[in-house]
Amino acid sequence: MNFDIEKLEKIKVRDGQEFFFIQTFGCQMNEEDSEKLSGMLKSQGYEETENRDEASIVIFNTCCVRENAENKVFGNLGRLKNQKEKNPNLIIALCGCMMQQKGMADEILSRFPYVDIIFGTHNAYKFPEYLHRVQVEGVQVKEIFDKETEIVEGVPIDRKSNVKAFVTIMYGCNNFCTYCVVPYVRGRERSRRPEDIENEIKELVSNGYKEITLLGQNVNSYGKGLEEEITFAQLLRRINEIDGLERLRFMTSHPKDLTLDVVYAIRDCDKLCEQIHLPVQSGSNEILQKMNRHYNKEQYLELAKKIREEIPDVTFSTDIIVGFPGETEEDFEETINLVKEVRYDAAFTFIYSRRNHTPADKMEDQIPDDVKHDRFNRLVAAVNEGIVVGNKAAEGKIYEVLVEGTSKNNENKLTGRTRNAKLVNFDGCKEMIGKLVKVKIIEAKSFSLVGEVVEQ
C-alpha cells in the first residue's frame, strides 16, 4: 500500500509559522518512526523545534520494553500540564509501543485528560489525519489498531543525518521471548518487498548517503510471507551491488536464526561492515531456556567462534539482561564467563524489568533489587574491561573512517566510525564530513579512539 501524499496537500499549514517537537524513547525502529512523523509534518508546512515550549504540537514516541521508559513518559506528560494551561491550543500526541499495551491508552487519558491524540505502532501513517480532526473538529482522538496492517510505502521521512540512514526491511517479531512485549506491540513478522528496499537505498545513495543500516526486530527472519522467495543473505548480496553505496550494516540478529549464509555474505561482500550485533541475554543455559531463546551457551559460543574464523576483523556487540527470575549467582557467573570469552566491543546491559502480560512476569523467584543492581555493576565492569582491551589493540593501526560530523563533546573535533563500528575522534576540516578518510589511532580511550588523519 502506498502513502497518500496528495492528502497531505489538502491539510497543509496555511497561515503563519507552526512548530512541532518530537521526543523519542526506545530503539532505532522508534527513531525511524519519528523521522517519518517529522517527514509528514514538514510536508504539511510545519517546522521542527528543539524547544518544547515554543511548539504547537508535542509528540512523545514511546517505548515499553522497560518500566523506566514508561516512567519517563509519565513524568514528561505531567510537566506538560502547565504548558497546556498557558496554551490551550497546544496539541499533545502519544504514539509508539507503549500505546499498544492493553488498557494503557485509557489509563493515560484518565491520568492526563489534556492529551489530544493517541495512536499505536500500526497506524502512525494516519497521524496527519488525526491531527486534522483535532484542529478542525476539536475532538480527542484515540485509535489503536489491534492487528498489524499492510506495510505502507512512500511515507515522507525526515532523516536526521546526511551521511547515514536507517532502512527498515521488516516489522514485528514471532519469537515470544518470555520477558519481551515486542511481539504484542509490534505484531507478527512481515517483510518489505526487496525492490522497495532497493529503491529506497538507491534514492538515499543518489542524495549522497554513504552508509545504510538495515533494521528489523529479527532481520534474519526476512523474507517470510513474500511472494518472491528470498533469504536475508540473498537480500544482503543484492544490496551490496548498488552502485555508490559505501557501507552496509544491519541489526538486530537472533542467534538461533543467524545462518552461515549471512556470515559468508559479510565475508564476501565488500560493502558489508565487519560488525555484528548478536544479543546473548544470558550465559546460563537454564536462564536461556526460561527466556525461550531457543539456543544454548555452547551453540552461541560456537557461532561466535565460526564468525571470527570467517571474518577475522569482526567486532561483536550484544544485549544482556541481569536479574531474570530464578537467576542464581552461578547463572550470573556463567554470563560473566561468556562475556570474557567473547570479548564484546559494545554491550547494552539491562536490569530485568517486569512487563505485564509476559510469562516472565508470572514466574516465581523474582530477584531482589539490591541483588540485581549488584550484578549489573559487576557485569558492566566485565564488559568495559573487554572494551578497553579491544580499543588498546587498535592503537597504532590505520582505519578507514566514515566522517559523520563534529564530536558531541568537542565541536572542534570530527567524529566517525571504522568499518567495525569503533568510534574515532580526530582533528580535521568540516569539508571531510560525509567522506571516507584514513585515520591512524594514536590513543585508546575507554569507549572511543583518538586518531590523526593520514595524508589522503
Swiss-Prot record:
Entry annotated with the keyword Cytoplasm: yes
Binding site for [4Fe-4S] cluster 1: C27, C63, C97
Keyword Cell wall biogenesis/degradation: no
GO MF entries: 4 iron, 4 sulfur cluster binding; metal ion binding; N6-isopentenyladenosine methylthiotransferase activity
Catalytic activity: N(6)-dimethylallyladenosine(37) in tRNA + (sulfur carrier)-SH + AH2 + 2 S-adenosyl-L-methionine = 2-methylsulfanyl-N(6)-dimethylallyladenosine(37) in tRNA + (sulfur carrier)-H + 5'-deoxyadenosine + L-methionine + A + S-adenosyl-L-homocysteine + 2 H(+)
Listed SMART domains: Elp3
Origin: domain of life: Bacteria
NCBIfam families, per database record: miaB-methiolase, MiaB/RimO family radical SAM methylthiotransferase
Pfam family, one: UPF0004
InterPro entries linked to this entry: Elp3/MiaA/NifB-like_rSAM, Methylthiotransferase, Methylthiotransferase_CS, Methylthiotransferase_N, Methylthiotransferase_N_sf, MiaB_methiolase, rSAM, rSAM_horseshoe
Cofactor note (record): Binds 2 [4Fe-4S] clusters. One cluster is coordinated with 3 cysteines and an exchangeable S-adenosyl-L-methionine.
Family: Belongs to the methylthiotransferase family. MiaB subfamily.
UniProt binding sites for [4Fe-4S] cluster 2: C173, C177, C180
Function (record text): Catalyzes the methylthiolation of N6-(dimethylallyl)adenosine (i(6)A), leading to the formation of 2-methylthio-N6-(dimethylallyl)adenosine (ms(2)i(6)A) at position 37 in tRNAs that read codons beginning with uridine.
Cofactor: [4Fe-4S] cluster
Domain TRAM: 392-455
EC number(s) recorded for this UniProt protein: 2.8.4.3
UniProt-annotated location(s): Cytoplasm
Protein name: tRNA-2-methylthio-N(6)-dimethylallyladenosine synthase
EC top class named in words: transferase
Residue span(s) of domain MTTase N-terminal: 18-136
Record's keyword terms, sorted: 4Fe-4S, Cytoplasm, Iron, Iron-sulfur, Metal-binding, S-adenosyl-L-methionine, Transferase, tRNA processing
Subunit structure as annotated in this protein's UniProt entry: Monomer.
Gene: miaB
Occurrences of domain Radical SAM core (ranges): 159-391
Protein species of origin: Clostridium botulinum (strain Alaska E43 / Type E3)
Gene Ontology cellular-component annotations: cytosol
